[in-house]
C-alpha cells in the first residue's frame, strides 16, 4: 500500500494506519505564525483543488475546526534540518517541521497525496491515514540550468522552481554567463547585456557545425532576478548564481575587450555562435579583477546565497601562454605555469568573496594549480577529482556527467532522432534507471568524507534545448530520480518501487502540461519463458544472469570477477525438450578488450537434472552442439581459472 502512494522522494519512514482523512472545501489550515508564507502556498493549492477559498487560522486562536490541517514547528524533533513529522488521521492532518524548511517539505508530501488534476471532480478526497517521519540525506539537492546557451522566460523559471519544490529539491544553480550569451543585468557595466546578451547566429538542430544566421539573445533584469530569488526563497530554494571565469567568458570579453588578453595575435573577441570550448579567457590584469569584483558585488547584492559559483571549468590556457602580459604576471607572482595562474585567479576571487562573507563553488578544474582551501568543488568529470578534494579536506557537490547530466539522451539515440531533429541531444545516455542507481556517497571512504559530500545535482546544459518545451522534455521525469537520490539514504532506495510511484507522479506532470519524456524502462530481469537460470558468479552492474536467456539480443549477463574452476551457469528449462535441438552459447565482449569470453569451459546438458553430459568445449568463446529430446537443463561449466571476467550473450535453443 505504502508503495503505491505517488510520493517522490519516498519518505524515510512511512507507516500506514487505519482509516482515512477527508479533505474538502470545509478543511481549514491551523498554522504557527512563523509558517504564514508556507500556509499561503498550501492554501492556494487547496483552493485550486476545491474551487473554494480555504480558511486559515493562526494557531493561538482556539477556534474549533471540524476538519483541519495543522502546521507546526518543533525544533526539538530528533531529525536533521529540513526534516518533519506528519500524521494523517481521521480528525485531521498534522505536519510538524523541525524547522520552517521541514514544515514546507511536509507540505509537499501532503500535496503529492492530493489529486493531480485540479479542480477535483468530486467535492472531497479521502487520504489514507499514515504516519511519516522524514528527513533529507543531503543538504544540497540541486538542479542546474544553463540560461547562457539559450534564454528562457522568467515565468518558466518560476514554474520550474515550483516543480523543484514539489520534489524537495532546494538549490537552483543558475548558470547565467556563457561564451554565447551574458544573461544578468549589471548596472555598472551595461554593455555586458547590450552587447554580450546577443549573438549573430546559432547552430540549428541536426547540424551542430552550421549557422542559422539569426540574431538571438535576451537577459534578466535585476528586478526580475530579485523577484525570482524571493519566489524561490519562499519555496525554500536557494538560488546559487554562476558567473563563469576565467573561461566561458567570450560574451563578457566581447562587451569589454580591454579585460581580455589584448596582446595576443589576432585578438578579436565576439559573442560566440558555435558550441564547444572557446579560447577567450579573462586576462590577469588588476583592471580585470576590479571589473570582476564589481560584477560580483552586484551579484552578491542580488543573491543572498552563501555560495557563489564562479565556474572555473574548461578555461583553455592557450591565450595566457601567448600573452606577454600574462607571462609577466606568472613571473611576478612566482607561478610555474598557466595552471598555477588559473589557481591564482581563483584564489583572488575566493578571497574577494570571503570578504563579502560568501563561499566559492567551482567546477572540478578549480584544482588545477592547487585547490583553494575553503572552496567547494562541484565534481563533473572523473570521480577521482572528488577523491582529490576529499583528501584535501574540501567539500564537494556531486554532479558527475556520467550520472547527472540531463542533457544526455534518456532513450536510445536512434529512436529519438527518428522523431525529428529537435530531439537531438549533445550525446551520452542516461536513462532514468541509471540516474536512480547513482550513489552520491560512492566516493566516501569513511563518515568524515561522507560529511564532506554536501549533496548531488542534476545539470541541464542547453545547447540542444532551444525552447522551454525541450528543457521540460530533458528534465522530466529524470528530475524525480535525482530528487530521490538526493533525499533518501542509499539503503532506502528501491528502483522497482520508485518506478511504480513515478507513474503516479507523472500524472501530476501531465496535469500541469509538462512536456515530459516517456521513461525508458530497463529490461525486466526475467527469463523469456519462466525457465530458471542461476550462477555461482556474481553479477556486474545491472547485467543480470536472466539476461543470458531472456529472448533479447541486446542484453547480456556479465560476471564481475575473475573465474574459478567449476564456476557455472545453469539453466533449468521450464519443460523438457520435445525434440532434438541445437544449442549455442556465445560469450565475450569487444575483441579489442580481449574479450571477457570463456577461455576454458564446457557446454553440457542433462536429462535428469543432475547428471551432466558434454555437448562441446568452448572455442574462441563459443560452444554449440546438438542435445536430445527430453533434455531438462543446460550448463556452462568453467574448467580452468581465468583472469578476465565473463560476458554471456543470449543462449539459443533451436
Ligand atoms: C561542464 O560541463 N563544463 C562543467
Task: Provide a role label for each language-model segment.
Residues 359-375, 381-528:
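Flexible, acidic glycine-rich loops studded with aromatic residues
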Residues 636-644:
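Short beta-strand-plus-loop segments that form exposed binding edges in beta-rich domains
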Residues 257, 271-273, 277-373, 380-388:
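Active-site neighborhood of glycoside hydrolase catalytic domains
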Residues 571, 622-628:
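Exposed aromatic-hydrophobic patches
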Residues 3-140, 470, 485-519:
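Contiguous, structured surface segment used for ligand recognition
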Residues 520-579, 586-601, 617-618, 650-654:
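Disordered, acidic Ser/Thr/Pro-rich linker "stalks" and the adjacent N-terminal cap
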Residues 75-307, 348, 352, 452, ...:
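Feature activates predominantly on carbohydrate-active enzymes
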Amino acid at each position: 500500500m505504502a508503495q503505491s502512494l505517488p510520493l517522490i522522494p519516498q519518505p524515510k519512514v512511512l507507516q500506514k494506519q487505519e482509516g482515512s482523512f477527508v479533505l474538502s472545501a470545509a478543511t481549514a489550515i491551523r498554522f504557527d505564525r512563523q509558517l504564514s508564507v508556507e500556509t499561503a502556498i498550501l492554501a492556494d493549492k487547496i483552493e485550486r483543488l476545491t474551487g473554494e477559498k480555504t480558511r486559515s487560522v493562526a494557531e493561538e486562536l482556539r477556534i474549533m475546526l471540524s476538519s483541519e490541517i495543522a502546521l507546526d514547528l518543533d525544533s526539538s524533533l530528533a531529525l536533521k534540518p529540513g526534516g518533519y513529522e506528519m500524521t494523517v488521521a481521521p480528525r485531521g492532518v498534522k505536519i510538524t517541521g523541525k524547522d520552517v524548511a521541514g514544515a514546507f517539505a511536509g507540505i509537499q508530501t501532503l500535496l503529492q497525496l492530493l489529486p493531480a488534476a485540479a479542480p477535483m471532480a468530486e467535492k472531497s478526497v479521502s487520504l489514507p491515514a499514515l504516519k511519516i517521519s522524514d528527513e533529507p540525506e543531503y543538504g544540497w539537492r540541486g538542479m542546474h540550468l544553463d540560461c547562457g546557451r539559450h534564454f528562457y522566460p522568467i515565468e518558466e523559471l518560476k514554474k520550474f522552481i515550483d516543480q523543484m519544490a514539489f520534489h524537495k529539491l532546494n538549490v537552483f544553480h543558475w548558470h547565467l554567463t556563457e561564451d554565447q550569451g551574458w544573461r544578468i543585468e549589471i548596472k555598472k557595466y551595461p554593455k555586458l547585456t547590450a552587447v554580450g546578451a546577443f549573438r549573430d547566429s546559432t547552430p540549428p538542430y541536426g547540424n551542430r557545425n552550421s549557422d542559422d544566421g539569426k540574431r538571438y539573445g535576451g537577459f534578466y533584469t535585476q528586478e526580475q532576478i530579485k523577484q525570482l530569488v524571493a519566489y524561490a526563497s519562499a519555496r525554500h530554494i536557494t538560488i546559487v548564481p554562476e558567473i563563469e571565469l576565467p573561461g566561458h567568458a567570450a560574451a563578457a570579453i566581447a562587451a569589454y575587450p580591454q579585460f581580455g588578453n589584448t596582446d595576443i595575435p589576432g585578438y578579436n573577441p565576439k559573442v560566440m555562435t558555435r558550441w564547444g570550448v572557446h579560447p577567450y579567457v579573462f586576462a590577469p590584469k588588476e583592471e580585470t579583477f576590479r571589473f570582476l569584483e564589481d560584477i560580483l558585488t552586484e551579484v552578491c547584492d542580488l543573491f543572498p546565497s552563501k555560495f557563489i559559483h564562479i565556474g572555473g571549468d574548461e578555461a583553455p590556457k592557450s591565450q595566457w601562454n601567448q600573452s606577454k602580459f600574462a607571462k609577466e604576471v606568472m613571473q611576478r607572482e612566482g607561478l610555474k605555469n598557466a595552471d598555477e595562474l588559473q589557481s591564482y585567479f581563483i584564489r583572488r576571487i575566493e578571497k574577494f568573496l570571503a570578504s563579502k562573507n560568501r563561499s566559492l563553488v567551482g567546477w572540478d578544474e578549480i584544482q588545477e594549480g592547487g585547490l583553494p582551501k575553503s572552496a567547494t568543488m562541484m565534481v563533473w568529470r572523473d570521480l577521482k577529482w572528488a577523491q582529490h578534494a576529499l583528501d584535501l579536506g574540501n567539500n564537494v557537490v556531486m554532479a558527475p556527467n556520467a550520472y547527472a547530466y540531463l542533457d544526455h539522451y534518456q532513450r536510445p539515440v536512434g529512436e529519438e532522432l527518428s522523431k525529428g531533429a529537435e530531439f537531438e541531444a549533445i550525446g551520452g545516455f542516461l536513462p532514468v534507471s541509471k540516474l536512480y542507481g547513482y550513489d552520491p556517497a560512492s566516493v566516501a571512504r569513511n563518515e568524515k568524507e561522507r560529511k564532506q559530500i554536501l549533496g548531488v545535482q542534476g545539470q541541464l546544459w542547453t545547447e540542444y534545448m532551444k525552447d522551454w518545451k525541450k528543457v521540460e522534455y530533458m528534465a522530466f521525469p529524470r528530475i524525480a530520480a535525482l530528487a530521490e537520490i538526493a533525499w533518501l539514504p542509499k539503503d532506502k532506495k528501491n528502483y522497482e518501487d520508485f518506478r511504480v510511484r513515478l507513474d503516479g507522479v507523472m500524472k501530476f506532470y501531465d496535469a500541469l502540461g509538462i512536456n515530459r519524456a516517456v521513461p525508458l524502462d530497463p529490461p525486466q530481469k526475467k527469463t523469456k519463458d519462466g525457465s530458471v537460470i542461476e550462477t555461482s558468479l556474481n553479477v556486474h552492474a545491472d547485467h543480470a544472469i536472466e539476461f543470458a536467456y531472456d529472448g533479447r539480443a541486446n542484453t547480456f549477463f556479465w560476471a564481475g570477477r575473475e573465474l574459478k574452476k567449476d564456476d557455472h551457469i545453469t539453466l533449468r528449462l521450464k519443460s523438457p525438450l520435445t525434440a532434438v535441438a541445437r544449442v549455442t552459447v556465445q560469450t565475450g565482449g569487444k575483441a579489442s578488450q580481449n574479450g571477457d569470453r570463456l577461455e576454458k569451459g564446457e557446454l553440457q546438458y542433462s536429462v535428469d537434472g543432475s547428471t551432466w553430459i558434454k555437448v562441446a568445449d568452448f572455442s574462441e568463446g563459443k560452444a554449440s552442439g546438438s542435445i536430445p529430446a527430453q533434455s531438462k537443463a543446460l550448463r556452462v561449466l568453467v574448467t580452468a581459472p581465468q583472469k578476465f571476467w565473463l560476458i554471456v550473450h543470449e543462449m539459443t535453443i533451436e
